[in-house]
């Protein structure tokens, strides 16, 4: 008898059968799945799926595994779903990587004794010793199928193919057969019923005792709640009867018929491809395996990252044209005098490019091995309480880093020879010398005629020259400072040019970008603040001002208002003030124009803005003079503002009266757009002025009304909800107040009733007490009468009982006497006989 031990290495055939069975039966029926595999148990099938065949498992995540182990040590249950493996696989792979790192370190230090078969771990399926069995074959790759398979394997494969191809089981067939019988029974009953009806026999439907008539009633019907809309028209709508339609057309195709049609199509399609299925199976399997291998190779292949092109097509055309022009010039010179041939050097642009080669890509570090070494060193480290040196780790540039949950990847790109500096014939990919950038310059350095001296440096800039000069000066000053103390002191005055050059010299260390941006931002904000402070008070406070300013007319009006002064200096000072006011108003109309101005845009103001220091001195002088005039020397701005406000309030009434009187004599002239005196105008001009004022007032009223209507409409939209809520709240408040008033009236009524009841209660209580006393007396009399009668009743009952007893005794005596008489008579008869 052959004994089969289930288990062992998995084969490709078993993997495919397992995947097909899982797709049909799911991931819960492992016993049924394992019945398709002769040599595997349900537990092994489940382990094979979750440990190897699950598509969510990724098998090349060593770098991510080490990175997560560094971030979350010993938390394998947390790391497993992130990596896409199980916790056991993560732990085994982690230990294997540490062992590999240790073995490599031993090899580098010369401590390894060489790798042989005995040194290989037993957990590696490829390194098993003879006679050993893999303890965890579910986590290993499948073994290829042999060309000549065993009979058991062929039988298993054919049985699995037949079972998996059968989509309908025994239960499904039985259900289909029951449905067919039920349909045949129904059709036979209908045929019988029709024949009896044709013969004149009507079968009366037998009502079911329990259940529902589904032809007459609607099961689980719920009448809809009456709504707000009238549905009488819909209820009165007449539906046409299905006259001329068959029952089959009304019912449509049943689900069983649809399933049969679908099954018939599947069988037909399967029958068409069944002939060449056997030949196509092997070819399709080989093509699928080949495709998977190609995808694996593509995944392993490194991504090609080319540098950005430094020269475009148009630049290449320009370079070709420049080269052709140089060659033509050289041919022209070569055809002429030989003495001029030496004036042209060899400036071929492709001279060095012919010998140039693409630099080699910098070698990449093995991040997996570096992280494994770091983790191994950290595991072997002692406690920090001992005070020893830190654990030796690789630099921050090597490894996966600590930036996030995913490891850091350094993309390797091919170096660009055009963007790589070539000094001394050696191409370097990094910038080692400051001063010259690694990007190609616009004009290459070619000096065949030795025009530049040897001391000049290629790529120097004026900044580098100034920096070198400042460095030499500092070195010279340091040397002078190191000299011994002089016996005679001499002072040398540094010229202004040297001071300016020293100020222009830049510092040795480059300023940080963040500090520079902060300094420039602070400077801009300070300049903006000063610009805002330089504005006039009218602009700052937004006071009304004229749209257009005529400087000459305004200056004439202001100068004409100057009272004739005996002091000519005071009059000249007033004129200077008026000139400054007119120029400032003109500057405001240009720098801050109002809508409707006639000043063209982009016009620069001719006003010379005074310096900030002069303005500050003038404000201080005005402040001091105003404080002295108000009798508050040394007062602050706030105190002066309060004092001026108090003085203005005292004269407000007088000012209003004076302005009203002055206002009566002024009208607005539309021609000059100013307020003029009435007496200086003719009647026609005065009428035109009044008409213009009326029109302006009407326009202003219309504008204000339009604005008010828009505001009302806008507020109506915004406050419509609030108004509704207000109405509801008002109604609720009114209802509550009415309820309060009604409650107050009820309370007053009940208080009045309380007073009446308190007044009438004593009399009623006294009357009730008298009635109670009468009732109590009557009750006592009746109770006494009842006790007397009860005693007499008991006496009578006792007498009756005594008489009954006497009667019984008397009857007994009579009977006894009669018996004695009979006995005596008997004795006499006996004696006589």
Curated annotation (Swiss-Prot):
Its main location: cytoplasm. PANTHER family: CELL DIVISION CYCLE 5-LIKE PROTEIN. Residues 30-53, 76-98 bind DNA. InterPro entries: CDC5L/Cef1, Cdc5p/Cef1_C, Homeodomain-like_sf, Myb_dom, SANT/Myb, SANT_CDC5L_II. It comes from Cryptococcus neoformans var. neoformans serotype D (strain B-3501A) (Filobasidiella neoformans). This is Pre-mRNA-splicing factor CEF1. GO terms for biological process: mRNA cis splicing, via spliceosome. One of its GO terms (molecular function) is DNA binding. Residues 245-306, 722-808 form a coiled coil. One of its GO terms (cellular component) is Prp19 complex. Residues 2-57, 58-102 form the HTH myb-type domain. Belongs to the CEF1 family.
């Amino acid at each position: 008898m052959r004994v089969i031990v289930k288990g062992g290495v998995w084969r490709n055939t078993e993997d495919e059968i397992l995947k097909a069975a899982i797709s049909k039966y799911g991931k819960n029926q492992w016993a049924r799945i394992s019945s398709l595999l002769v040599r595997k148990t349900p537990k092994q099938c489940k382990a094979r799926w979750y440990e190897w065949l699950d598509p969510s498992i990724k098998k090349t995540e060593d770098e991510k595994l080490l990175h997560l182990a560094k971030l979350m040590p010993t938390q394998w249950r947390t790391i497993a779903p992130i990596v896409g493996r199980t916790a056991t696989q993560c732990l085994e792979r982690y230990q294997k990587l540490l062992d590999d790192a240790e073995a490599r370190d031993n090899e580098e230090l010369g401590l390894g004794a060489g790798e042989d078969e005995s040194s290989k771990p037993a957990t590696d399926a490829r390194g098993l010793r003879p006679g050993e069995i893999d303890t965890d074959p579910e986590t290993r790759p499948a073994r290829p199928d042999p060309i000549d398979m065993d009979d058991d394997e062929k039988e298993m494969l054919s049985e699995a193919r037949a079972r998996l191809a059968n989509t309908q089981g025994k239960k499904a067939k039985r259900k289909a057969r029951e449905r067919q019988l039920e349909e045949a029974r129904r059709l036979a009953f209908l045929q019988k019923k029709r024949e009896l009806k044709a013969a004149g026999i009507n079968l009366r439907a037998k009502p079911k005792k329990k259940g529902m008539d589904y032809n007459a009633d609607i099961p689980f019907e719920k009448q809809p709640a009456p709504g707000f809309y009238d549905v009488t028209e819909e209820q009165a709508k007449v539906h046409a009867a299905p006259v001329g339609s068959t029952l089959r057309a009304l019912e449509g195709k049943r689900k069983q018929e649809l399933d049969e049609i679908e099954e018939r199509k599947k069988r037909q399609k399967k029958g068409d491809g069944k002939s060449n299925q056997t030949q196509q199976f092997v070819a399709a399997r080989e093509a699928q395996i080949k495709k998977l291998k190609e995808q694996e190779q593509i995944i392993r292949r490194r991504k090609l990252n080319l540098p950005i092109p430094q020269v475009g097509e148009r630049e290449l055309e320009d370079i070709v044209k420049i080269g052709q022009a140089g060659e033509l010039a050289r041919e022209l010179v070569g055809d002429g005098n030989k003495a001029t041939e030496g004036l042209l050097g060899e400036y071929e642009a492709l001279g060095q490019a012919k010998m140039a080669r693409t630099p080699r890509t910098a070698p990449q570090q093995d991040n997996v091995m570096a992280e494994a070494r770091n983790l191994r060193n950290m595991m072997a480290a002692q406690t920090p309480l001992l005070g020893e040196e830190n654990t030796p780790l690789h630099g921050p540039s090597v490894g996966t880093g600590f930036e996030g949950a995913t490891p850091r990847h350094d993309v390797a790109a091919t170096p660009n020879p055009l963007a790589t500096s070539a000094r001394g014939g050696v191409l370097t990919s990094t910038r080692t010398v400051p001063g010259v950038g690694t990007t190609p310059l616009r004009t290459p350095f070619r000096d065949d005629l030795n025009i530049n001296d040897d001391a000049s440096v290629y790529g120097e800039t004026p900044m580098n020259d100034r920096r070198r000069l400042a460095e030499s000066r500092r070195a010279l000053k340091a040397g002078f400072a190191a000299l011994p103390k002089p016996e005679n002191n001499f002072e040398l005055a540094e010229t202004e040019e040297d001071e300016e050059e020293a100020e222009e010299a830049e510092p040795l260390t480059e300023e940080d970008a963040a500090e520079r941006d902060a300094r420039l931002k602070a400077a801009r904000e300070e300049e903006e603040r000063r610009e805002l402070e330089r504005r006039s008070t009218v602009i700052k406070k937004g006071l009304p001002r004229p749209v257009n300013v005529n400087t000459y007319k305004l200056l004439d009006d202001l100068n004409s208002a100057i009272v004739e002064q005996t002091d000519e200096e005071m009059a000249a000072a007033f004129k200077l003030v008026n000139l400054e006011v007119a120029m400032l108003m003109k500057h405001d109309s240009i720098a801050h124009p109002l809508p409707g101005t006639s000043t063209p845009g982009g016009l620069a103001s001719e006003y010379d803005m005074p310096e900030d220091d002069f303005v500050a001195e003038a404000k201080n002088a005005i402040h001091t003079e105003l404080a002295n005039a108000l009798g508050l020397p040394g007062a602050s701005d706030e105190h002066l503002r309060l004092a001026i406000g108090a003085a203005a309030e005292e004269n407000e009434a007088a000012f209003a009266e004076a302005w009203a009187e002055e206002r009566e004599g002024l009208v607005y002239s539309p021609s000059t757009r100013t307020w003029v005196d009435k007496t200086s105008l003719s009647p026609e001009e005065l009428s035109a002025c009044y008409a213009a004022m009326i029109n302006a007032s009407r326009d202003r009223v219309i504008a204000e009304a339009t604005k008010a209507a828009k505001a009302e409409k806008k507020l109506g939209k915004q406050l419509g909800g609030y108004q509704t809520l207000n109405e509801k709240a008002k109604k609720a408040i009114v209802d509550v107040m009415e309820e309060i008033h009604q409650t107050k009236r009820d309370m007053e009524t009940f208080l009045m009733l309380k007073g009446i009841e308190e007044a009438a209660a004593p009399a009623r209580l006294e009357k009730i007490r008298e009635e109670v006393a009468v009732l109590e007396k009557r009750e006592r009399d009746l109770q006494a009468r009842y006790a007397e009668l009860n005693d007499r009743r008991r006496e009578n009952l006792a007498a009756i009982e005594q008489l009954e007893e006497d009667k019984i005794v008397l009857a007994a005596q009579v009977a006894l006497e009669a018996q004695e008489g009979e006995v005596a008579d008997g004795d006499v008869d006996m004696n006589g006989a």
